[in-house]
């Protein structure tokens, strides 16, 4: 008896963020693939135009000394539940992807005020 795609998606939806991250890592190792988006090689031309980055990723690098404040800030930024926010705070990782520069700076300020260290990429 094999599972349908819908059953697999439902099972994944019930998992916590940390469990899903572990699942992705296991799939990468099992099948020898990477979940990272492929990087397209830029055409080397004399008139290469450098575009300003419009989408940013905010990454939590350290929760700082006050973990409780950092967890509260992570919950406020991501909308995650308490357990998922705690797991993300302890493990570090991506808080938000594809946000504007203003939004990224706002998140960075909020997290820094909570004592956490974040990086905007």
Swiss-Prot record:
GO cellular component assignments: cytosolic large ribosomal subunit
Keyword Ribosomal protein belongs to the record: yes
A family per Pfam: Ribosomal_L12_N
Biological process terms in GO annotation: translation
Keywords per UniProt: Ribonucleoprotein, Ribosomal protein
Domain of life from the UniProt record: Bacteria
Gene3D superfamilies per the UniProt record, alphabetical: 3.30.1390.10, Single helix bin
GO MF, any single term: mRNA binding
Family under the similarity heading: Belongs to the bacterial ribosomal protein bL12 family.
Subunit structure: Homodimer. Part of the ribosomal stalk of the 50S ribosomal subunit. Forms a multimeric L10(L12)X complex, where L10 forms an elongated spine to which 2 to 4 L12 dimers bind in a sequential fashion. Binds GTP-bound translation factors.
Function: Forms part of the ribosomal stalk which helps the ribosome interact with GTP-bound translation factors. Is thus essential for accurate translation.
PANTHER family linked: 39S RIBOSOMAL PROTEIN L12, LARGE RIBOSOMAL SUBUNIT PROTEIN BL12M
UniProt name for this protein: Large ribosomal subunit protein bL12
Gene name per UniProt: rplL
């Amino acid at each position: 008896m094999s599972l349908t795609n819908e059953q697999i998606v439902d099972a994944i939806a019930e998992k916590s963020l940390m469990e899903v991250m572990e699942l992705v890592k296991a799939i990468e190792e099992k099948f020898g693939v990477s979940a990272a988006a492929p990087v397209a090689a830029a055409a080397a031309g004399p008139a290469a135009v450098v575009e300003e980055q419009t989408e940013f990723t905010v990454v939590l690098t350290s929760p700082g000394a006050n973990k409780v404040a950092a967890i509260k800030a992570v919950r406020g930024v991501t909308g995650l539940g308490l357990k998922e926010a705690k797991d993300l705070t302890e493990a570090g990782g991506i808080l938000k992807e594809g946000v504007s520069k203003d939004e990224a700076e706002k998140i960075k300020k909020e997290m820094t005020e909570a004592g956490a260290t974040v990086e905007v990429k």
